[in-house]
Regions:
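Substrate-positioning beta->alpha
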Residues: 232-239, 253-273, 293-300
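Conserved beta-loop-beta element that borders a ligand/cofactor-binding pocket
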Residues: 182, 208-258, 282-283
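Conserved Rossmann-fold cofactor-binding substructure of NAD(P)-dependent oxidoreductases
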Residues: 117-140
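Flexible, Lys/Arg-rich cytosolic regulatory linkers and terminal tails that connect or flank
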Residues: 2-63, 176
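Conserved Rossmann-fold NAD(P)-dependent oxidoreductase catalytic core, especially the SDR/UDP-sugar
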Residues: 27, 143, 147-206, 211-212
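Mid/C-terminal beta-alpha module of Rossmann-like enzyme folds, strongest
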Residues: 277-313
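NAD(P)-cofactor binding segment of oxidoreductase domains
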Residues: 2-18, 88-95, 135, 155-182
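N-terminal Rossmann NAD(P)H-binding glycine-rich loop of SDR-like oxidoreductase domains
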Residues: 63-84
């Protein structure tokens, strides 16, 4: 697949692709559903294949709750969780419009074995969150709710601390009190020796979970860090897409700048697997593969749109 795309790249044509066999088998798409080349094709490598047994371990037949279910990571978590056949899936989200959108999407998926429950609420509201966890007897929590845009959190640092750090503390304490089996925090590589407020809030959230994991309890706390996720909100991909749609220019601040990337589905599969492997207080760091040059990424996107990069010389 990557070889074919590499051959087509230089040609002045708009490249489109057919659905994968797995997408056809799951009923997500039909054979005649042509689409633009997917983001994963820009990685220049094949996505990591998941361990199916690990994907099922903490989900199949269980009551699962995802915080931040309307976000780019949270919604993909929900998509993958549905196909692992949980007993119930609770979409916990503070933003009404985001919750509405993700619920409408899942209503179209024929999954009679899964009860999907859209719940409005904030992890900062202890009483509300505890009532939900208790009422549904939640067994597994994936905590994806967070403020993650570095400049915005820097400008609104107190809200960043309240949401990312204290929100995690409240959610984790509720999990302990209600004897939730598994609690997985979606963290970031920016928590490593943090140089900004967002990274610091996530690092403190990790330390909170590690401290709680030392208590005598039946709840297993696990943290998973990953870096740049292709096409997530705030990444360069949506920005480049919009710039290409507008006819340019596509802005790259440094032609030699490199970043490590994963697709959203790939990252989420590894999050679910890491959550199943955790023993308590573990921090998993995802192997992001080989670095991708941002200039090359932008060039590929332009070429796959049937356009050419203008030679300024």
């Amino acid at each position: 697949r990557n070889e074919i795309i590499a051959i087509l790249n230089p040609l002045p044509i708009n490249v489109r692709s057919l659905p994968s066999v797995s997408e056809l088998a799951q009923g997500k798409l039909k054979i005649d559903d042509l689409r633009d080349v997917s983001i994963k094709d820009l990685l220049g490598r094949e996505p990591v294949n998941p361990n199916e047994e690990l994907l099922k371990l903490k989900i199949t037949g269980k009551v699962v709750l995802v915080t931040g279910a309307g976000g780019s990571i949270g919604s993909e978590l929900c998509r993958q969780i549905i196909f692992q056949k949980p007993k119930q899936l609770i979409l916990y989200e503070i933003n009404e419009f985001s919750l509405y959108n993700v619920e409408q999407e899942f209503d179209k998926i024929e999954m009679p074995h899964v009860e999907i429950l859209p719940v409005l609420g904030s992890v900062r509201d202890r009483k509300r969150f505890q009532n939900v966890v208790k009422h549904f007897s939640v067994e597994t929590i994936y905590h994806a709710a967070a403020y993650k845009h570095v400049p915005l959190v820097e400008y609104n640092n107190s809200e960043g601390v309240l949401n990312n750090t204290f929100g995690t503390l409240i959610a984790a304490e509720v999990a302990l009190a209600e004897k939730v089996e598994t609690f997985v925090l979606i963290s970031t590589d920016k928590a490593v020796r943090p140089t900004n407020t967002m990274g610091a809030t996530k690092r403190i959230a990790e330390l909170v979970l590690q401290a709680l994991s030392k208590q005598e309890s039946s709840t297993c706390f696990t943290m998973v860090r990953f870096g740049n996720v292709l096409d997530s909100s705030g990444s360069v991909i949506p920005l480049f897409k919009q710039q290409i749609k507008n006819g340019g220019p596509v802005t790259v601040t440094n032609a030699n700048m490199v970043r490590y990337f994963m697709t959203i589905p790939e990252a989420v599969e590894l999050v679910v697997q890491a959550g199943a492997m955790g023993k308590g207080g573990d921090v998993f760091v995802l192997d992001m593969g080989e670095p991708v040059r941002i200039y090359d990424l932008a060039t590929k996107m332009i070429q796959l749109s049937g356009l050419q990069v203008l030679d300024e010389d």
